């Protein structure tokens, strides 16, 4: 989307939430009810609905799967969430993982659910009945994933240290397990599994701090007497994290992962890996001949025993504070061609974080344009907010050929600082002109409408408010004054705040969230789900609570397409 399309830059805001009253209780050794452990552990949107259809998601607790439909409403007070099906697991299993598939004959939606019993139960959601059960793991299952390339192929990650690849295709009905990823891959319970978009690569991670990448063979379109067993991953490393890894995912050919106690989500790449290259076979995987090596990779061959080329590279770290000792906390990336990739994560202190990865490139472009204009026009530069609806050509015509015009993304909001007692008047506008402001005070006051209110001091959750609609605390807030030592005219506080959120030049720096939203009450986020078209984001967690966030709302009183939101 072009930078001028303000709606595409909008980040989600909380629309509503609900708590599902579960009847699951934990029985102590003496048979007494010791505590209520009701908790949603997983949420997944049905990915096979036709474009424009109301999205459907499943929130999975230990004994239930709650199937909900989300619809646009014209009233901000109307509940957009409707429960359309409720599935109860009456067995002994405490479930924690789910994924979607569909019936290969009827195309009816299927929901796969798994937990500590180690079986994958497949339910026909339309009928609310058990469709079939996949048996084979020797321990509990902690994660499920569906291949983006084939809705009938799913993967399960288990405490038995293996990943099983299952097929729901009719030809594999008698032997649904088509592949086992095990052997020397992992040594302890697995927590996360993810497919590449092409369906031929799988990531796995867990308690042993190891992240593995496996290349899958092509599976025959006929009955298989025994599953294919792959003993070695094509990439393996315990160097990315220093604690158990509870979430891993592909972002294109890049990888996102997080670990307990680290309070970060790491973006990194495997050197030499490209999904465009031929798929390596099982015999191509490197074997652990030297157990002292913490990383081995098929994609970075060692030329000589003395050479130690980098096998992976850290690219960025997204700051997720206040996770504490909690684990089993999952992020989710919304990544659809032609739309902004948005990363979402909820911590253990009732906050949800959002990062729009398209903003990094726009920020770099803006800072480069600003620097170039400063040099080319000897400091005579005017910064125009794109949210004002003025094009670059129009701005250049107004200011003339002797002034450099730089278009600033509307979501780059100058930081506001608390007004000192007795301090005067209004702050500066957004002109960067080497220490003096060519714009008049009326323009400054108009620009301040894009600044944050006092309740939004993270300056990543900005709304384009009028003066009459500001938070009460905003009366004591003014824009940070221009710094004469700054080459860009913005205050040091503003430039630092922008760098903290949008500067990717330091791969070990902590990138603050572009938007951080808090809710009342204690809440530990467990999983995030995105609707297929990106307009809804659902976060589930303890207390069987689901938070429903929305973008591009059409409801009266909610507004739409706020540039800085």
UniProtKB/Swiss-Prot annotation:
The ranges of region (Disordered) come to 417-488
> Can you name a GO cellular component term?
nucleus
Q: One of this protein's GO BP terms? A: chromatin organization
Q: Which SMART domains match?
A: WD40
Q: Where does the record place Low complexity bias?
A: 429-450
| Keywords, comma-separated and alphabetical | Chromatin regulator, Nucleus, Repeat, Repressor, Transcription, Transcription regulation, WD repeat
Q: List residue spans for each WD repeat.
A: 89-133, 136-176, 185-224, 240-278, 519-559
Segments of skewed composition (Polar residues): 451-468
Q: Which Pfam families does the protein's record reference?
A: PRC2_EED_ins, WD40
Localization per record: Nucleus
- Describe the protein's quaternary organization and the partners it interacts with: Component of the polycomb repressive complex 2 (PRC2) that consists of four core subunits icluding EZH2, EED, SUZ12, and RBBP4, among which EZH2 is the catalytic subunit and which minimally requires EED and SUZ12 for catalysis.
Q: Which family does it belong to?
A: Belongs to the WD repeat ESC family.
> Briefly, what is this protein's role?
Component of the of the Polycomb Repressive Complex 2 (PRC2), a histone H3 lysine methyltransferase responsible for generating mono-, di-, and tri-methylation on Lys27 (H3K27me1, H3K27me2 and H3K27me3). The tri-methylated form is known to be critical in gene repression, and its proper placement is essential in defining repression patterns during development. EED is not a catalytic subunit but is required for the complex regulation of histone H3 lysine methylation by EZH2.
Q: Which named protein is this? A: Polycomb protein EED
Q: Which organism is it from?
A: Chaetomium thermophilum (strain DSM 1495 / CBS 144.50 / IMI 039719) (Thermochaetoides thermophila)
Q: Which gene encodes it?
A: EED
């Amino acid at each position: 989307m072009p930078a001028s399309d303000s709606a595409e830059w909008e980040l989600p805001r909380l629309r509503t939430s609900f708590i599902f009253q579960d009847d699951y209780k934990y029985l102590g050794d003496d048979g007494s009810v010791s505590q209520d452990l009701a908790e949603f552990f997983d949420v997944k949107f049905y990915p096979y609905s036709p474009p424009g259809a109301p999205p459907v998601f499943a929130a999975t607790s230990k004994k239930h799967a709650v199937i909900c439909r989300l619809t646009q409403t014209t009233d901000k007070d109307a509940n957009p969430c409707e429960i359309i099906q409720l599935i109860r697991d009456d067995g002994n299993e405490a479930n924690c993982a789910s994924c979607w598939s569909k019936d290969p004959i009827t195309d009816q939606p299927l929901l796969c659910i798994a937990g500590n019993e180690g079986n994958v139960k497949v339910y026909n959601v339309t009928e609310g009945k058990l469709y079939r059960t996949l048996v084979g793991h020797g321990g509990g299952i902690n994660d499920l994933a569906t291949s983006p390339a084939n809705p009938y192929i799913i993967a399960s990650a288990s405490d038995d240290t293996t990943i099983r690849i299952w097929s729901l295709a009719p030809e594999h009905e008698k032997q649904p397990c088509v592949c086992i990823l095990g052997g020397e891959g992992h040594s302890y319970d697995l927590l996360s599994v993810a497919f590449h978009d092409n369906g031929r690569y799988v990531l796995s991670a867990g308690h042993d701090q190891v992240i593995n990448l496996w290349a899958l063979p092509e599976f025959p379109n006929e009955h298989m007497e025994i599953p294919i067993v792959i003993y070695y991953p094509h990439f393996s490393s315990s160097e990315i994290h220093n604690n158990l890894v509870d979430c891993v995912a592909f972002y294109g050919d890049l990888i996102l992962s997080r670990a307990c106690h680290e309070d970060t989500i790491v973006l990194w790449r495997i050197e030499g890996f490209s999904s465009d290259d031929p798929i390596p076979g099982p015999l191509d995987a490197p074997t652990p001949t030297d157990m002292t090596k913490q990383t081995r990779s098929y994609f970075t061959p060692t030329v000589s025993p003395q050479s130690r080329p980098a096998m992976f590279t850290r690219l960025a770290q997204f700051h997720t504070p206040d996770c504490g000792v909690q684990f089993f906390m999952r992020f989710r990336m919304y990544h659809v061609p032609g739309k902004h990739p948005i990363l979402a994560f909820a911590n253990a202190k009732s906050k949800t974080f959002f990062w729009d990865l398209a903003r990094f490139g726009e920020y770099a472009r803006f800072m480069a344009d600003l620097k170039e204009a400063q040099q080319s026009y000897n400091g005579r530069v005017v910064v125009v907010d794109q949210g004002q609806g003025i094009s670059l050509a129009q701005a250049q015509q107004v200011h003339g050929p002797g002034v450099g015009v730089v278009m600033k993304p509307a979501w780059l909001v100058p930081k506001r600082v608390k007004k000192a007692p007795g301090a005067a008047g209004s702050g500066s506008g957004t002109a960067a002109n080497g220490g003096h402001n060519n714009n008049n005070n009326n323009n400054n006051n108009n620009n301040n409408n894009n600044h944050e209110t006092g309740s939004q001091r993270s300056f990543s959750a900005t709304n384009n408010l009028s003066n009459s609609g500001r938070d009460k605390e905003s009366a004591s807030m003014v824009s940070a004054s221009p710094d004469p030592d700054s080459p860009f005219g913005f205050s040091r506080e503003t430039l630092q705040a922008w760098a903290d959120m949008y500067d990717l030049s330091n791969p070990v720096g902590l990138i603050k969230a572009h938007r951080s939203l808090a809710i009342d009450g204690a809440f530990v986020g467990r999983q995030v789900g995105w609707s297929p078209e990106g307009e809804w984001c659902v976060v589930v967690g303890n207390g069987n609570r689901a938070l429903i966030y929305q973008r591009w709302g059409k409801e009266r009183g909610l507004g739409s397409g706020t540039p800085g939101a």
